[in-house]
Amino acid sequence: MTLTASSSSRAVTNSPVVVALDYHNRDDALSFVDKIDPRDCRLKVGKEMFTLFGPQFVRELQQRGFDIFLDLKFHDIPNTAAHAVAAAADLGVWMVNVHASGGARMMTAAREALVPYGKDAPLLIAVTVLTSMEASDLADLGVTLSPADYAERLAALTQKCGFDGVVCSAQEAVRFKQVFGQEFKLVTPGIRPQGSDAGDQRRIMTPEQALAAGVDYMVIGRPVTQSVDPAQTLKAINASLQRSA
């Protein structure tokens, strides 16, 4: 895989690293952000922080120069999902996502909502199977497919609906690149440098392994946010990825 910048005109980095900002406190989050360089990563804002601090928090991160992945995983009736995705585009985020399990009509409505934004539209990504889920979790929901097979089915639907890519586990990346092509972007949580604790992720991989597997954007949280020197940790990860590319 070649390390390339996003097609978004807002992109300020060609690093595939997206740091997950999982903080309970706004000041703690901004204190961390002020220690790192927007040229070394993008930032992911999820449900907790967005619910606590709202769009203004996203704007504060953007004012510091960061591209933002708004990880709210919209899953609703088509009209509501479309309006939510358009609101994310109005906020100027770099990437936004929905749940593929919302179905084709919901995903098509979301994609169509971004057409007026042209080249300024955020990347539109769908979540397939959460990386915390195992086969037993899917069985509880009445899904008899393995996590990998179910994720591939949802990814195929996502591509059919015209999305830019999917969130998937790194283990699915090789297969997905073969099936869906190089332009279909793969966003992968559960990426942890060698020696990091697995935390609540079940299907994990190192950054170097993820790059080799074809992952386009790798989400890394606590190994960076809890690092004594997060700026150096990011530089070390990016350097290792450049060596592996």
Curated annotation (Swiss-Prot):
Full protein name: Orotidine 5'-phosphate decarboxylase
Q: Which gene encodes it?
A: pyrF
State whether it acts alone or in a complex, and with which partners, per the record: Homodimer.
Q: Which reaction does it catalyse?
A: orotidine 5'-phosphate + H(+) = UMP + CO2
Key word Acyltransferase present: no
Q: Which family does it belong to?
A: Belongs to the OMP decarboxylase family. Type 1 subfamily.
Kindly give the SMART domains that the UniProt entry links to this protein.
OMPdecase
**Active-site feature positions:** K73 (proton donor)
Instruction: List membrane-spanning regions.
Output: none
Per the UniProt entry, the signal peptide is none
Pathway the protein acts in? Pyrimidine metabolism; UMP biosynthesis via de novo pathway; UMP from orotate: step 2/2
Record organism: Shigella dysenteriae serotype 1 (strain Sd197)
